[in-house]
From Swiss-Prot:
The keyword Ribosomal protein applies. Keywords: Ribonucleoprotein, Ribosomal protein, RNA-binding, rRNA-binding. Pfam families: Ribosom_S12_S23. GO terms for biological process: translation. CDD domains: Ribosomal_S23 (cd03367). The keyword Nucleus does not apply. This is Small ribosomal subunit protein uS12. It comes from Staphylothermus marinus (strain ATCC 43588 / DSM 3639 / JCM 9404 / F1). NCBIfam families: PRK04211.1, uS12_E_A. The lineage of its organism: Archaea, Thermoproteota, Thermoprotei, Desulfurococcales, Desulfurococcaceae. Belongs to the universal ribosomal protein uS12 family.
Amino acid sequence: MAGKKAPNGLFAARKLRRKRLKFRWSQREFKIKMLGLKKKHDPLEGAPMARGIVLEKVGVEARQPNSAVRKCVRVQLAKNGKVVTAFVPFDGGINYIDEHDEVIIEGIGGPRGRSMGDIPGVRYKVIMVNGVSLKALYLGKKQKPVR
């Protein structure tokens, strides 16, 4: 008759918890979380938003079965100099953004911090241009300041 694999009893909780923790290190998601690998890899370095300078406007083709050119901008982040692609929301939103404008970007909201919908490789979206909300510019509530 083989021995028991796990202790049982009133005072076995600590031992059970430690044993479970040992096995959790073999799970990919747990290891990434505990070692902070996502934060090390993330261009925003774990922050919810980041400021950057627009380098150029680019059109990204939508994935199948859709057919469109999604308007995006290449942004160089101020905090670390990394260059990322950010989606510009709203109909004609790209017209409010010029090269060398200062923009604030945030995550686009895809699953697990990845890209969303039919825009391949784009994980961020523009929310502010030169200190003014892109939505306010689009709705005509505010004017873009001249820099």
